[in-house]
């Protein structure tokens, strides 16, 4: 690898019709204190001016690399980005989100301190407004106080690394000690304490390219592809470092995902967890109960979305109801799964598996 590319971070950003927000996202990358990066913007032939904006920004900054492609989904775009990336490290960013200025510096420092394969930071839920940041429980945060606390989290990592400055060129191999506020997980801990605890996002992560190798996103999944990418990586990594520092702003829909109507693509959530069940049961058998309980919950969530549809429309999805029923049955039948279910789901799964039509009718009446 050329010395110029040594230590470079390749940021992969798929986009389609994102003119309203991609400028803010790209600007947050240009404001990074770590300057050794390239940004691959994979544009699925946008029709709203996104393409023109990205090319204009690329003229201003040669690190921005627009790539026009056929519209065939986020996973295919990320895979193309992986093929074309020149960096030693990889990061995925969604075009409607943004980064804290210290994010790349902090994650790079963590890889150097811990010699781990992945470095992960926490994130804010963000409504797109200057002061609209939320914690995990969706409570609005006091922006100024939180900004100071988060800067302190970043400073602990950078001071420990000795790189509290802009534009670090490469990960230093000299330390293998995590900074305060950074925890290093081995592979089993990463599965049990992180992936299977709701942390299945592929963004807010800095990956060593060598750890990814030939692993790619599954293009047959429209939901759950992030989780399966991380699951597929498991056998190629040794450790993961995770910090409390929040470096990523994840744009939220203030109406809430649960209010979105059912779409057939939601069934991919079940498919992805069925794949995960097979992998976890084989490689991490102690987590069998946990992963199968998640499969059951994913079946219940999809069934709940179908239940909220008007009666005539709901009848169109009888095949999907059967698939949900099968997933829930399979999930709760696994050893240890019932004990892992959230309490509210223990009664729900019992009713749904016993009489699906009654459950759907009751759920429809309750929610509507």
Per-range role (PLM):
Residues 153-156, 162-165, 169-172, 308-368:
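Membrane-interface aromatic/basic loop that binds lipid-linked glycans or pyrophosphate carriers
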Residues 1-28:
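N-proximal low-complexity "stem/linker" segments adjacent to membrane-targeting elements
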Residues 35, 43-52, 94:
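A conserved acidic beta->alpha catalytic loop
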Residues 69-85:
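Glycine-rich, basic loop-to-helix element that forms the pyrophosphate-binding segment
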Residues 90:
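Short aromatic/hydrophobic "clamp" motif used to bind/position activated sugar donors
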């Amino acid at each position: 690898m050329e010395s110029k590319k040594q230590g470079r971070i390749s940021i992969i950003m798929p986009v389609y019709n994102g003119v309203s927000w991609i400028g803010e996202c790209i600007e947050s990358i240009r404001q990074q204190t770590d300057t050794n990066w390239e940004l691959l913007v994979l544009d699925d032939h946008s029709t709203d001016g996104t393409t023109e904006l990205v090319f204009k920004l690329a003229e201003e900054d040669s690190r921005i690399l627009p790539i026009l492609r056929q519209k065939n989904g986020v996973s295919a775009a990320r895979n193309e980005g992986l093929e074309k990336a020149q960096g030693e490290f990889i990061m995925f960013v969604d075009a409607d989100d943004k980064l804290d200025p210290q994010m790349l510096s902090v994650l790079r420092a963590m890889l150097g301190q811990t010699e781990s394969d992945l470095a992960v930071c926490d994130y804010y839920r963000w409504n797109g407004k200057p002061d609209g940041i939320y914690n995990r429980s969706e409570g609005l945060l006091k922006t100024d106080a939180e900004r100071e606390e988060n800067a302190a989290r970043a400073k602990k990592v950078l001071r420990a690394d000795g790189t509290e400055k802009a534009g670090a060129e490469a990960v230093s191999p000299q330390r293998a000690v995590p900074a305060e506020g950074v925890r290093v997980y081995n592979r089993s801990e990463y599965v049990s304490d992180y992936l299977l605890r709701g942390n299945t996002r592929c963004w807010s992560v800095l990956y060593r390219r060598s750890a990814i190798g030939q692993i790619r996103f599954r293009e047959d999944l429209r939901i759950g592809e992030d989780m399966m990418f991380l699951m597929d990586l498991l056998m190629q990594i040794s450790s993961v470092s995770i910090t409390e520092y929040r470096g990523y702003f994840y744009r939220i829909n203030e109406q809430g995902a649960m209010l979105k109507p059912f779409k057939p693509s939601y069934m991919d959530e079940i498919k992805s967890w069925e794949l995960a069940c097979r992998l976890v049961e084989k490689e991490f058998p102690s987590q069998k109960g946990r992963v199968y309980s998640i499969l059951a919950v994913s079946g219940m969530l999809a069934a709940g979305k179908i239940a909220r549809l008007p009666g005539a429309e709901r009848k169109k999805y009888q095949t999907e109801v059967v698939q949900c029923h099968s997933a829930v049955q399979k999930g709760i039948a696994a050893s240890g799964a019932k004990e892992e279910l959230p309490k509210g789901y223990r009664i729900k799964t019992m009713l749904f598996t016993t009489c699906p039509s009654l459950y759907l009718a009751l759920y429809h009446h309750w929610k509507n």
